[in-house]
Design a protein with these regions (language model features):
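Surface-exposed, low-complexity/disordered Ser/Thr/Gly/Pro/Asn-rich loops and linkers
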Residues: 1-51
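His/Asp/Glu-rich, glycine-adjacent segments
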Residues: 4-6, 71, 86
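Extended, low-complexity, turn-rich repeat/linker tracts enriched in Gly/Pro/Ser/Thr and Asp/Glu
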Residues: 63-73
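A short, hydrophobic C-terminal helix/tail in secreted or cell-surface proteins
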Residues: 169-187
Length: 192
């Protein structure tokens, strides 16, 4: 499916690069309407650090660029999972703090300024995981085809960071070995 530049004025289903007319500042979004069915946009990241990662922190801004003319709240739901390919992922919902819910829900259909009235900044949080070196993490936002008109929802300013498993300093190993040696010495001394 192609990505179409739009301001939120169209109710045609599909992927959109939403933004104000003539602006280079854009957000990746969708209108899951008509024949599109559910729309997913995904990001694949491979852990090439050489170490296990114990968590990831994700933040983004949710933006609504179109009011579909319905009073129902529509959402982008964030899910994640691990797998070599998109088709092989067992998806896990990250939690409510990661989801974006539409903010303009009225019977008047039309465009919404996603950088102002339609914006919810700072969504996301931290997810504990066991992300092995070499594994691929998939993150996706899901926009379902709701009954009636669909709102135009988008993501912008996506940021991710990761936490590696703690690796003991060499001095920690030296102290551990010295401590074990002292315990062994004391045990031998008591026997004598």
């Amino acid at each position: 499916m192609a990505v179409t530049a739009g301001t939120g004025s169209s109710n045609s289903g599909g992927f959109y690069s939403f933004g104000s007319a003539g602006s280079a500042e854009r957000a990746l979004g969708s209108v899951a309407s008509g024949s599109t069915g559910t729309i997913n946009y995904a990001l694949a990241l491979t852990n090439n650090t050489g170490a296990a990662l114990t968590s990831f922190t994700l933040s983004y801004d949710g933006e609504q660029w179109r009011n579909g003319g319905v009073t129902a709240t529509h959402s982008l739901t964030l899910q994640y999972g691990f797998g070599a390919s998109y088709a092989g992922v067992a998806w896990t919902t990250a939690g409510a703090g990661f989801d974006f819910a539409s903010v303009m829900n009225s019977t008047t259909a039309g465009l919404v300024d996603g950088n102002a009235a339609g914006k919810v900044a700072g969504l996301g949080g931290t997810v504990a995981t066991n992300w092995a070196a070499g594994d691929t993490l998939w993150v996706r936002w899901t926009d379902i085809d709701n009954t009636g008109g669909d709102h135009g929802l988008a993501i912008d300013n996506v940021s991710m960071s990761f936490t590696a498993a703690a690796v003991p300093e060499p001095s920690t190993y030296a102290m551990l070995l010295a401590g074990l040696g002292a315990v062994g010495f004391l045990a031998r001394r008591r026997r004598a």
